[in-house]
């Protein structure tokens, strides 16, 4: 029996891990005439740390909830430092006791790197793969050397990342970004009916993140921004997307006295598609919102000490990946001291009421998404598609294609072939280069 030990520390990593597990179970990357292809499902066992996606993918039970390690920031992490150290010790011990044949860590470098470093000293021959290259192009380029000393292989999500690691001797493969595996919704009218959105309502999507600290840090300014918008847009409906249903209880106390209509939903991709505009916390969600064809602004702040430390370390002008790749501000950013209600509300209103501005942002964002691996057919967009009038009354109900969305079929389309998606590519490499030789040895022993 071959054991693969996975470690994912947050929802995005859990999604990637779950998809890779599914492809590994489906004999990804093993030739059909291979003597090991029919042996794979019985020969490989998944263990480690993960979430619901990894648990749904197979007989996998997490060593502990990933919410325990879903932390970030220099100062924010301090109150949890002793708890994290215990979890690192527990994970290292579990890896050794499991007699794992392969360790796969996914993102969450604050936790996964420390675990891998300890394990490398104790098990120098254990094969290790890390998925999601650290952003050495943004800050601390020296981390590439550190990763090269520990890992056997690194999977990068961005096409320009491998050279940073190959030049220091680490085998780094570009597999593409996981958002290419998402299915984005295109029928805005049907979604408005599903969420019982009146034909006259304008929809603002709000994302606050997956960490409790992030949510609490942004709630006051986000709610104040929305209240400002409501003064001039009293037909506003706000939908808060929830990374975890339990987060509703955190948000509700901040909404006790508000006048605007709101609801909560965990179906984030549907909400991104149905929204007229989004107020987003910086992160992977911004790529998903852009892929859904929705204009947005990004706002983010951290603890003040963390901010100044980051300012000393970081060497890029933007925090949003689309802006970083474009090297210009396509998506408006309101970071730290600029994360203020008046600035945020003014820009959101501009996107709500200026269809030309909203259209231009979506088109420019789409060009960057294509660089990340999305395929693009002829665009079905025109500036009039952003007029809210098109979604009113009978005209909206009769119109089939007139939507201000970049549809999966017509604009931002991932390949319909499984072997073009990142998790398939990752699973193929894992199986062909790391598992197949082991499985052949097991077959020979039998």
UniProtKB/Swiss-Prot annotation:
Domain called RPE3 insert: residue spans: 379-418
E.C. code: 2.4.1.182
Residues making up the signal peptide according to the UniProt record: none
The keyword Lipid metabolism belongs to this UniProt entry's keyword annotation: yes
GO BP terms in the entry: lipid A biosynthetic process
UniProt family annotation: Belongs to the LpxB family.
Alphabetical list of SUPFAM superfamilies matching this protein: UDP-Glycosyltransferase/glycogen phosphorylase
MF-aspect GO terms: lipid-A-disaccharide synthase activity; phospholipid binding
NCBIfam families in alphabetical order: lpxB, RPE3
Lineage: Bacteria, Pseudomonadati, Pseudomonadota, Alphaproteobacteria, Rickettsiales
Reaction(s) this enzyme catalyzes, per UniProt: a lipid X + a UDP-2-N,3-O-bis[(3R)-3-hydroxyacyl]-alpha-D-glucosamine = a lipid A disaccharide + UDP + H(+)
Keywords: Glycosyltransferase, Lipid A biosynthesis, Lipid biosynthesis, Lipid metabolism, Transferase
Listed name of the protein: Lipid-A-disaccharide synthase
Pfam families named in the record: LpxB (PF02684)
Keyword Lipid metabolism among record annotations: yes
GO cellular component, one term: membrane
Gene name per UniProt: lpxB
InterPro entries according to UniProt: Glyco_trans_19, RPE3
Described purpose of this protein according to its UniProt entry: Condensation of UDP-2,3-diacylglucosamine and 2,3-diacylglucosamine-1-phosphate to form lipid A disaccharide, a precursor of lipid A, a phosphorylated glycolipid that anchors the lipopolysaccharide to the outer membrane of the cell.
Top-level lineage group: Bacteria
Pathway the protein acts in: Bacterial outer membrane biogenesis; LPS lipid A biosynthesis
